[in-house]
Regions:
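Non-catalytic terminal/accessory segments
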Residues: 1-221
Length: 221
């Protein structure tokens, strides 16, 4: 029914996303109304370059996600008890590689190389961490990886975080290698126990304990 119009709105800080069930003209009207309200009531300017109208089947960027809809593959029972495929659409959240790349750059854990015309991510030493002790280094990497995963774990393609993890892992190995004037191969031989990278430390009672590097995967939550 084209007479039924619906609108969904979500905002985080100064970023907002509006979903409109309606026509392109409806979307243009909503955008113009928002622009006028911001200008007249709040004395703010809406950027036309950053405020886009996008078909819901195409990705819209919001808070590091690509958001779009696709046909549902879910099965359901009809009124006769027969299994049929749903004809509706479902929202999809995708973690894009641009988001991962930016975070790796923020952490100074990667650089970009171009090989055969293709962009390649390369892990690098985090030199500002070399003076930290082993436990502090592993704990810092763990906190950053867990924080990234916790935020993006709702993405439909959350296992893609493995690409982020791989770079972070080798950035940590290289940081240890630089700290001890060694090589990644020797560092892995020294610190890997039962297939997991671990560092030893003493607690307040003098007991030796081990802190493991994150290795729990990136299953969607």
């Amino acid at each position: 029914d084209s007479s039924i119009k619906r609108l969904k709105y979500v905002r985080y800080a100064d970023d907002f996303l509006i979903g409109v069930i309606g026509s392109l003209e409806d979307c243009k009207t909503v955008k113009e109304d928002i622009k006028n309200y911001l200008k007249e009531a709040l004395k703010l300017e809406l950027s036309d370059e950053k405020t886009l109208i996008t078909n819901a089947q195409k990705p819209a960027k919001f808070l590091g996600f690509d958001i779009f809809i696709r046909r549902s593959n879910d099965l359901r029972k009809d009124i006769n008890g027969k299994t049929i495929r749903s004809l509706g659409h479902v929202p999809v959240l995708y973690l894009n590689y641009e988001t991962m790349r930016k975070k790796l750059f923020d952490y100074k854990a990667a650089r970009i190389a171009v090989e055969n015309g293709k962009e390649i991510w390369k892990s690098i030493v985090r030199t500002y961490m070399i003076d930290l002790d082993d436990l502090e280094i592993v704990s810092q990497f763990n906190a950053e990886i867990r924080g990234f995963y916790n935020y993006y774990s709702i993405a439909n393609n959350s296992p893609a975080i493995n690409s982020f993890y791989h770079i972070m892992s080798y950035s940590m190995y290289k940081t240890f290698a630089r700290k001890y004037k060694s090589s990644v191969k020797k560092i892995l031989f020294q610190y890997k126990k039962d297939g997991t990278f671990k560092v030893a430390y003493e607690n307040s009672k003098g007991k030796t304990l081990y802190q493991s590097f994150y290795h729990d995967g990136f299953k969607r939550k």
